[in-house]
Amino acid sequence: MFLGTYTPKLDDKGRLTLPAKFRDALAGGLMVTKGQDHSLAVYPREEFTALARKAAAASRSDPEARAFVRGLAAGTDEQHADAQGRITLSADHRRYAGLSKDCVVIGSVDFLEIWDAQAWQTYVEANEENYSQATGIALGEIV
């Protein structure tokens, strides 16, 4: 499970060091793709494969399903962390997420999200008031 918030730096070559506690779970390879709210999503290869298969099984006659599959496939980069636990983020991914040197990596249970630090702070501030309401929507009667 991917949990927590980390603040790695993006180096001049576009490399980001993944949190040490997640490296074993990502050792079999990982997929970096465009995420929600201009973040990047990082999936273990197996998790991404299941997601991609589910997306591909959607009706090909549905324009929204086709658009999602195209965006997912075209916007994904397969990576393997180096010996120092770094991955290289493509220029397109860095541009999409507006990444500067200061980044935030957050655990999102079954995947990671990579955010520009300022964008993450803005998102958190804008959504603090909605957290209680979102909890009820996401978990319903569980909480």
Swiss-Prot record:
GO biological process terms, semicolon-separated: negative regulation of DNA-templated transcription initiation
Entry keyword Transcription regulation: yes
Residues annotated as domain SpoVT-AbrB: 5-47, 76-119
GO cellular component: cytoplasm; nucleoid
Domain of life: Bacteria
Keywords for this protein: Cytoplasm, DNA-binding, Repeat, Transcription, Transcription regulation
PROSITE patterns named among the record's database cross-references: SPOVT_ABRB
Compartments it resides in: Cytoplasm, Nucleoid
A single MF term (Gene Ontology): DNA-binding transcription factor activity
Subunit structure, interactors included: Forms oligomers.
Protein family: Belongs to the MraZ family.
Name recorded for this polypeptide: Transcriptional regulator MraZ
Source organism: Rhodococcus opacus (strain B4)
Gene: mraZ
